[in-house]
């Protein structure tokens, strides 16, 4: 089974388990979320309200004909369904490979439950075991050089790179008008909760792609067509 089909298996199973009539749902971003939106549409549920985490998920919601809202009108959500770049044994996450971690974190924090859906390659024992692109860090444009220098210092010993755009000249610009630094690490991360706090405290850092203590359940689609559900 292809990775796309693994993603579909996970997304369909999570939607079937958690999304009911009248649900207020945060819709994450990334390649797996398309399948979650497809399944919500297929089920034909009534009075389902969807809050997006990015321009991409806004488009998915609109194209599916689902009811679109935002946190101003719907500030409390029942559930957010989102993907992840990596999930470790303690349910620490790295997110932000698609550059949407700030809005994803805001929407997830506004939800009673965050459910992660992914293919089997996103499950690991420690962060960095499978995901090799580093921690995505959203920064104010004027601060990206000082932030990178701080991340390189002995306080962090990370290797930061400004994420560059593919189809335009210059850096990637987020939906919020900020830049993204990918902070790579050469060995498994330790004390992830403290690391997330320390990076966030650097002036100019808007948000990090480290999600700590935000979810207790993840769905991983397997190559044999089954779905592995992990929870704590």
From Swiss-Prot:
| GO terms (BP aspect) | D-ribose metabolic process; pentose-phosphate shunt, non-oxidative branch
Signal sequence bounds: none
Question: Which EC number applies?
Answer: 5.3.1.6
Report the pathway entry: Carbohydrate degradation; pentose phosphate pathway; D-ribose 5-phosphate from D-ribulose 5-phosphate (non-oxidative stage): step 1/1
Going by the UniProt record, its keywords in alphabetical order are: Isomerase
* Broad class of enzyme this protein falls into: isomerase
Kindly state which reaction or reactions the protein catalyses: aldehydo-D-ribose 5-phosphate = D-ribulose 5-phosphate
Concerning Pfam families, the annotation shows: Rib_5-P_isom_A
- Gene Ontology CC annotations of this record: cytoplasm
- Taxonomically, which superkingdom? Eukaryota
The record's family statement is: Belongs to the ribose 5-phosphate isomerase family.
Supply the name of the protein.
Answer: Ribose-5-phosphate isomerase
**Phylogenetic placement of the source organism:** Eukaryota, Amoebozoa, Evosea, Eumycetozoa, Dictyostelia
Q: Which gene encodes it?
A: rpiA
């Amino acid at each position: 089974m292809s990775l796309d089909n693994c993603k579909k298996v996970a997304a369909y199973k999570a939607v079937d388990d958690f999304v009911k009539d009248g649900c207020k749902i945060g819709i994450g971003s990334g390649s797996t979320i398309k399948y979650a939106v497809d399944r919500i549409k297929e089920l034909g549920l009534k009075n389902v309200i969807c809050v997006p985490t990015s321009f991409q998920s806004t488009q998915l919601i609109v194209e599916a004909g689902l009811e679109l809202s935002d946190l101003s009108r719907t500030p409390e959500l029942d559930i957010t369904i989102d993907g992840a770049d990596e999930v470790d044994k303690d349910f620490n996450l790295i997110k932000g490979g698609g550059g949407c971690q700030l809005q994803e974190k805001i929407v997830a924090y506004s939800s009673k439950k965050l459910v992660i859906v992914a293919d089997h390659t996103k499950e690991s024992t420690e962060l960095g075991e499978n995901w090799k692109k580093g921690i995505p860090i959203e920064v104010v444009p004027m601060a990206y050089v000082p932030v990178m220098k701080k991340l390189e210092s002995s306080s962090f010993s990370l290797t930061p790179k400004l994420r560059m755009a593919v189809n335009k000249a210059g850096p990637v610009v987020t939906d919020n008008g900020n830049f993204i630094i990918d902070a790579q690490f050469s060995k498994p991360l330790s004390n992830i909760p403290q690391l997330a706090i320390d990076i966030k405290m650097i002036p100019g850092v808007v948000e990090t792609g480290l999600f700590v203590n935000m979810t207790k359940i993840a769905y991983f689609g397997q190559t044999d067509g089954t779905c592995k559900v992990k929870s704590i």
